[in-house]
């Protein structure tokens, strides 16, 4: 199963050393069973996106580990890929960028010709051949149709997908330089959120009870984190409800709305997927 990790400390810039590498169940450790690609998306001081990615696992891609340890941003988006569609290439590796936004996805969407038809000219922004990047292009199209309103456009796009296309899962994170959105749909995979206050509680013991991790960069900065699973033993991790859209604004205010209360019109089970796609969606 692909792993998603997003964090925002907006409007403050922070280092993400603790979360990307040192947690007991960190992305680097997870990637040992997700060998198709890793990527890290951040934002420069001028607000422009910076995405660094490799079609390799993090345990074989030491640069990812080094860069993750030293990156500074207001929002972060990291992804460890186990491919469901698309070859192991840089264009197919998450995260993706469009119109100053960064996006990553875990799940499977089928009937890509139908999706391409709906994208029309927005298909030109897709550089690879994954369902994920196509979904991002559809979201971009709907954001434009809603005058740049990300929440409205994202909601409109995923409602269209839920109604029109076969779906196994759509878990996603989308970030700008100072905002974050996350969606879990349907109940197929988990997606957790943690609101972290600044202070001494930023010292934790990992799930095995033997490794203690500290983050000096976050001791005086509150953060909101979204991840495919709890990344430490903090009891305040909460799973998003199926169909729930999480929005964290520029001041770390959180809005949670169930935008897809119904199951997909064309749900897929593991047995409906080809062998590669099915393997990509298993917990590892």
For each of these PLM feature ranges, what is it?
Residues 1-57, 245, 253-268, 272-273, ...:
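Extreme N-terminus nucleophile/cap motif
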Residues 8-11, 43-48, 99, 175-179, ...:
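Short acidic-glycine loop/turn motifs at beta-strand connectors
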Residues 54-66, 78-100, 117-121:
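Short acidic (Asp/Glu) patches
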Residues 37-74, 78, 184-188:
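Structured interaction and signal-relay segments at domain junctions
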Residues 200-245:
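A conserved acidic, glycine/proline-rich C-terminal tail/linker
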Residues 147-187:
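Catalytic core of PPM/PP2C metal-dependent serine/threonine phosphatase domains
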